[in-house]
From Swiss-Prot:
Parts of the chain that traverse the membrane: none
The organism's place on the tree of life at top rank: Bacteria
Native source organism of the sequence: Glaesserella parasuis serovar 5 (strain SH0165) (Haemophilus parasuis)
Alphabetical keyword list: Ribonucleoprotein, Ribosomal protein, RNA-binding, rRNA-binding, tRNA-binding
The protein's name in its UniProt record: Small ribosomal subunit protein uS7
Subunit comment: Part of the 30S ribosomal subunit. Contacts proteins S9 and S11.
One example GO MF annotation: rRNA binding
NCBIfam families, alphabetized: rpsG_bact (TIGR01029)
Length: 156
């Protein structure tokens, strides 16, 4: 960590098709081994399928799905006097987005559908309907924070 001043976060260019920075970030999360064009085609195919299925605008459906997966609280380990407590803390907005994207991609990779575009479309569709693995992960994190609410005074 720098001592003098905080570092400006690197600006991310919006994606070429929709002009959304959020979608560009999602493409980067999905990307493997620097193969961005493949990641873009997977995301765009998935969004096309999602738009046909939901009847909404592709970007709007994507944002609804992302909103349903974003966590508001999480637990962090804090060591106090020889024992470790899981302390619930609020999640920063940038981290909320990052976690939601990561969870959606992880859940899509674990699915058993044919192509990655199909898996991603199905996971985004499930997330938009408040079901699926990514939403379950968010609920588990919230449940863990709720269970450890007694240790909230250890916050830093």
């Amino acid at each position: 960590m720098p001592r003098r001043r905080s570092i400006e976060p690197r600006k991310i260019l919006p994606d070429p098709k929709f002009g959304s920075e959020l979608l560009a970030k999602f493409i980067n999360v999905l990307m493997v081994d620097g193969k961005k064009s493949i990641a873009e085609s997977i995301v765009y195919n998935a969004l096309e399928t999602l738009a046909q299925r939901s009847g909404k605008d592709a970007l709007e459906a994507f944002e609804i799905a992302l909103e349903n997966v974003r966590p508001t609280v999480e637990v962090k380990s804090r060591r106090v006097g020889g024992s470790t407590y899981q302390v619930p803390v609020e999640v920063r907005p940038t981290r909320r987005n990052a976690l939601a994207m990561r969870w959606i991609v992880e859940a899509a990779r674990k699915r058993g559908d044919k192509s990655m575009a199909m898996r991603l479309a199905n996971e985004l569709s499930d997330a938009a309907d408040n079901k699926g693995s990514a939403v379950k992960k968010r609920e588990d994190v919230h449940r863990m924070a709720e269970a450890n609410k007694a240790f909230a005074h250890y916050r830093w």
